[in-house]
């Protein structure tokens, strides 16, 4: 299964950018309150709707950071299941579909345990100092479960468009 991911935040940033889905412009939402930095390029899977009412989040494993607004054709390795103050807030872990350096990665276990712990630690603490924000229930699941969530998120977005007419 392949899909497009739009990057909002490059690896190593503390600035939290968001794409305004009405205008397409990139907005600085805030600087993270903690000293943590995004462990990988971070964005969303296009044409999806996650359980939190936003597009389904994604992390893309790359050798070099990209830039906000960059679109990458990806495939899933697994997913980090978590909840925040708005409900389900899963993060799909991906690699670029055409990157030969990543062709051997097909499952979550192909990502080192240490790197998975880095990602987990980031998402467990990155909202710690922000009033009214919380994170809970974080754990990793494999590619099959990630792909099922992606399919459900595509369907949620299609249903939303059918209901609202746009």
Residue ranges and their predicted role:
Residues 1-166:
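Hydrophobic N-terminal alpha-helices or hydrophobic patches in metabolic proteins across all domains
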């Amino acid at each position: 299964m392949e899909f497009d991911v739009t990057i909002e935040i490059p690896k190593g940033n503390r600035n939290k950018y968001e794409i305004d889905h009405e205008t397409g412009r990139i907005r600085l939402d805030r600087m993270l309150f903690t000293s943590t930095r995004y462990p990988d390029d971070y964005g969303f899977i296009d044409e999806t709707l996650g359980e939190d009412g936003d597009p389904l989040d994604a992390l893309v494993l790359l050798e070099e950071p990209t830039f906000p607004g960059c679109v990458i054709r990806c495939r899933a390795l697994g997913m980090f299941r978590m909840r925040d103050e708005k409900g389900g807030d899963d993060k799909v872990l991906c690699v670029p579909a055409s990157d030969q350096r990543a062709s051997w990665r097909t499952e979550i276990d192909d990502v080192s345990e240490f790197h998975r712990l880095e990602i987990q630690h980031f998402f467990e603490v990155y909202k710690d100092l922000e009033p009214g924000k919380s994170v809970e229930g974080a754990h990793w699941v494999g590619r099959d479960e990630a792909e099922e969530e992606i399919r459900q998120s595509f369907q949620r977005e299609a249903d939303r468009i059918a209901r609202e007419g746009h």
